[in-house]
Amino acid sequence: MLSVTQRGDAIVFSVRVQPRASRNTIGGEWQGALKVYLTAPPVEDRANESLRRLLAEHLEIPVAAVRILSGGRSRIKRVEVRGTTAQRIRELA
């Protein structure tokens, strides 16, 4: 089950990123984290920006409401989103 934490008016959860995938998509849950496939390479923050855009698109929130808290150089990241609910995050998985 996806581990989602409420922190004030924000939701924090883990994401497992697979860069250089064939398409940008959300692939369910992986060991408590949201599994995300991105076409962008993990170079010059391209994958991180692609992740922010993909999550914002699926959650129908502005890209500015999605922030990577930790793991900027790792496949496993902690992400904070504002303007949505924990239930909505769980539905992505």
Segments and roles (model prediction):
Residues 1-52, 58-63, 67-73, 77-93:
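Contiguous, often N-terminal, cationic amphipathic patches that form binding interfaces
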